[in-house]
Amino acid sequence: MNAKFILLLLVVTTTILLPDTQGAEVIKCRTPKDCADPCRKQTGCPHAKCMNKTCRCHRCG
């Protein structure tokens, strides 16, 4: 019983802490401005960050 509770707590915590990003396609960038148009095409939302020369697209809402 105790092991099942800990496993359930671990699963819930992991799903909460996962980032809300989409990144099926690798988009190279130098600045966040380089990510706005490709992310708008990919997700419908221009919210993005350039991290380690790769765009990270975020969903709206």
Swiss-Prot record:
Pfam families: Toxin_2 (PF00451). Residues 1-23 form the signal peptide. GO terms for molecular function: ion channel inhibitor activity; potassium channel regulator activity; toxin activity. Keywords: Amidation, Disulfide bond, Ion channel impairing toxin, Neurotoxin, Potassium channel impairing toxin, Secreted, Signal, Toxin. Its main location: secreted. Disulfide bonds join 29-50, 35-55, 39-57, 45-60. It is found in: Secreted. It comes from the Eukaryota. Expressed by the venom gland. The keyword Secreted applies. The keyword Transit peptide does not apply. One of its GO terms (cellular component) is extracellular region. The modification Cysteine amide is found at residue 60. Blocker of voltage-gated potassium channels. Belongs to the short scorpion toxin superfamily. Potassium channel inhibitor family. Alpha-KTx 06 subfamily. Has the structural arrangement of an alpha-helix connected to antiparallel beta-sheets by disulfide bonds (CS-alpha/beta). This is Potassium channel toxin alpha-KTx 6.8. It comes from Opistophthalmus carinatus (African yellow leg scorpion).
